Design a protein with these regions (language model features):
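Conserved alpha/beta-hydrolase "acid-adjacent" motif
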Residues: 499-505
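Catalytic histidine-centered segment of alpha/beta-hydrolase-like enzymes
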Residues: 524-537
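Macromolecular interaction modules
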Residues: 1-253
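Flexible "cap/lid" loop of the alpha/beta hydrolase fold
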Residues: 379-423
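Conserved alpha/beta-hydrolase catalytic His-Asp/Glu region
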Residues: 399-403, 415-485
Length: 546
């Protein structure tokens, strides 16, 4: 039977450690690594408001305490994963790490776990942490436990703003640690601590007897919520400080922070419920509550196709308050899961990104396969999407499309190109050439040949297995019926030279409930954000700022 518990860590940075470095390390490196573990269900940082030290505490709920003795967790503290930055940072922090087994909890009727609440709701929340040691007497210890559960917590529950009280005791996996009880009391930002109900709970005959006869030491600390970890880094605010040395990279190169006084960024990955890693880049506003725009790619490329658009968009002073989240869709890499890929799976991937990065809602922009993905996400998850722009796509795809796409897969299979870095089979030159010729206008090959060349390289290097699996999403879907019931406002966009799409997307705009428009981008084919980024950016700005 599993033993749930708590990893409870107090920290006090030395004066030599810049605050920005401390927060960047903790929020982008240390915390998310632990939240990626399946037995770590949440993690929080709190800052002291009682004027005492240590100044900071972090705690993590653990589903099975034995996991903290096993290699998966212990590896986080070894050189393979522990970076030089982590070592240098932790050398400037006084750390006290304690392990506790869970005993029980009492919660308010309307209690919602902190990790399930938006950060804007949690802000100001108070944590009262009480550490207690007792005399070595089993009967008195039993009396203490009865008092806490039968009188003390029920009386605290009458304090305005009380949310939850959770009790722990020193973990069995830490037999050398002195036996200690820890109770965490959670309160809303507006609460009755120090008021009459709280004073009544602290002044009863039973409590007086416990304090006089049973408790040998007790420390009460008061903290305020500072940060809720997710399984992927999202910290941008610290990266504007000159005190953050960068850029920084994890030892495996999969996570990077890119400091900048004007446009910091973090790059990492989110793991979906079925184990697929989705690389992403988050940049823009350093306000953690600023609105987010999610960009969803076409098939066969990565999020670099948005470079020119992002540069143009963020250069506009009106857009300084936005964050932009780009990601490489399922199928860019070889490992793309075992379930059949369809537009519902791809929509769930966007939600997985939002959840991991603790983004309640976002504006979505997508092109081609990404275009129908953002449309479908808005239809399936309307409470998570504020608005969407669907580009160069269709609302339905007949089964006959399967043969066309399978023929394209066969072209790549015949070439048998292999990556020189990973040794895996990739799409190769032949299919890349015909694909990009179809996507771009002939004029672009004459006037800006670097653009099709860049996209061709992205297509050429796409995993063949990823292409083989993800292309199935372009076969046999139909969202027209759902569009008639749409709840989220949308805009449709197409390159004016993208075949029949300027005509068929006019019908898509008519089919969407809510008077959607179609905007055409001049001098552009299938990827207007690449081929004519200024005109595409203007259309996006008009939609967002109208």
């Amino acid at each position: 039977m599993a033993t749930p518990g708590l990893l409870y860590v107090t920290m006090h940075p030395r004066p030599s450690l810049p605050a920005a470095q401390f927060h960047d390390w903790y929020n982008s490196e240390h915390g998310p690594l632990r939240l990626r573990l399946p037995f770590v269900t949440n993690g929080f940082r709190y800052r002291a408001v009682d004027g005492e030290e240590p100044e900071w505490v972090a705690w993590y709920d653990i589903t099975e305490m034995e996991e903290l003795t096993r290699e998966t967790y212990l590896a986080l503290r070894e050189d393979g994963i522990k970076t030089p930055r982590e070592k240098a940072t932790m050398a400037q922090i006084a750390v006290d790490r304690r392990l506790y087994d869970f005993l029980g909890e009492q919660k308010a009727a309307d209690y919602t776990p902190l990790e399930d609440q938006p950060d804007t709701t949690v802000a100001g929340s108070v944590l009262v942490a009480v550490s207690t040691t007792l005399v070595d007497d089993a009967d008195k210890e039993a009396d203490y436990n009865r008092w806490y559960t039968e009188e003390h917590i029920p009386m605290l529950s009458r304090v305005p703003g009380w949310r939850c009280s959770r009790r722990f005791v020193t973990a069995a996996i830490d037999p050398k640690a002195p036996r200690e009880y820890l109770t965490l009391h959670e309160y809303k930002a507006t609460n009755g601590l120090g008021g009459p109900e709280h004073k009544a709970a602290m002044d009863t005959p039973w409590r007086t007897r416990i304090v006089n006869d049973t408790i040998t030491s007790q420390r009460r600390r008061v903290f305020e919520w500072a940060y809720t970890f997710g399984p992927a880094p999202r910290e941008l605010s610290s990266l504007t400080s000159k005190d953050v040395a960068g850029p920084w990279s994890s030892n495996d190169g999969r996570t990077r922070t890119l400091p900048s006084p004007t446009r910091p960024a973090v790059e990492s990955f989110v793991t979906t419920a079925d184990g697929v890693d989705l690389p992403y880049r988050l940049e823009g506003s350093t306000d953690p509550h600023s609105p987010v725009i999610v960009l969803s790619n076409s098939i066969l490329v990565d999020y670099a196709i948005w470079d020119d658009f992002v540069n143009a968009f963020l250069a506009d002073p009106r857009n300084q308050g936005f964050r932009i989240l780009r990601y490489s869709t399922r199928g860019r890499l070889q490992a793309c899961g075992k379930q059949p890929i369809n537009i519902d799976v791809l929509a769930s991937d966007i939600i997985a990104l939002l959840d991991a990065l603790r983004i309640p809602q976002a504006t979505l922009i997508g092109v081609s396969l990404g275009g129908v993905t953002v449309l479908n996400t808005a239809l399936r998850y309307p409470t998570r999407v504020t608005r969407f722009i669907s580009c160069d796509t269709n609302s339905s795809s007949p089964e006959s499309n399967r043969k066309a796409w399978n023929d394209r897969v066969a072209v790549a299979e015949r070439e048998g190109a292999v990556s020189t870095t990973t040794q895996e089979t990739i799409v190769g030159d032949e299919l890349a050439e015909v694909t990009v010729r179809r996507w771009f206008t002939p004029e672009s090959y004459e006037t800006q040949p670097h653009l099709p060349a860049q996209v061709k390289e992205l297509v050429r290097t796409n995993s063949l297995e990823g292409f083989r699996q993800s292309v199935q999403a372009l076969c046999a879907y139909d969202v027209r019926e759902q569009m008639a019931q749409a709840q989220v406002p949308g805009l449709f966009v197409a390159g004016n030279s993208d075949g029949v799409l300027p005509k068929t997307m006019q019908q898509m705009a008519a089919d969407l409930k809510g008077d959607a428009e179609l905007k055409l981008i001049p001098k552009a084919g299938h990827l207007p954000m690449v081929e004519n980024a200024p005109a595409f950016t203007q259309v996006v700005n008009e939609f967002l700022h109208k």
